[in-house]
């Protein structure tokens, strides 16, 4: 059977932990690391403060060498624009041995709607 993108996203969502924007803010306030898996231009336009950027397409190749992601037990909040790429990325991180990863429901779009913590931009 041929898979659709939504089938793949739904399969990922079945095996990961998703958190609301409010839960993500609480995790980040308590030391979790934000991982932005959007494309670089999206990240540069605006991102969660202190988020580390690794695009979805390069995740498997770059995460192991990134200094902030050496501890596979560290708490990580993964986000994208609306939640699909972050779900796929979170499932991938779990397969790579990361034990405490969360996908943020609604992504950066939803984070930005209630921006009591304003996004950062790249200069």
Set out the residue ranges of the language-model regions:
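Rhodanese-like catalytic fold shared by cysteine-dependent sulfurtransferases
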Residues: 1-33, 40-75, 84-123
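Short, surface-exposed ligand- or partner-binding patches at beta-edge/loop junctions that are enriched
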Residues: 78-79
């Amino acid at each position: 059977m041929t898979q659709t993108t939504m089938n793949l996203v739904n399969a990922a969502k079945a095996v990961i932990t998703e958190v609301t924007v409010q839960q993500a803010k609480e995790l980040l306030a308590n030391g979790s690391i934000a991982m932005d898996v959007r494309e670089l231009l999206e990240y540069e336009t605006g991102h969660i403060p202190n988020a580390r950027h690794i695009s979805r397409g390069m995740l498997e190749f770059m995460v192991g060498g990134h200094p902030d992601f050496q501890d596979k037990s560290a708490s990580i909040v993964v986000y994208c624009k609306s939640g699909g790429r972050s779900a796929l990325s979170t499932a991938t991180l779990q397969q790579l041995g990361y034990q405490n990863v969360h996908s943020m429901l609604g992504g950066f779009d939803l984070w930005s709607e209630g921006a009591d913590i304003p996004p950062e931009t790249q200069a």
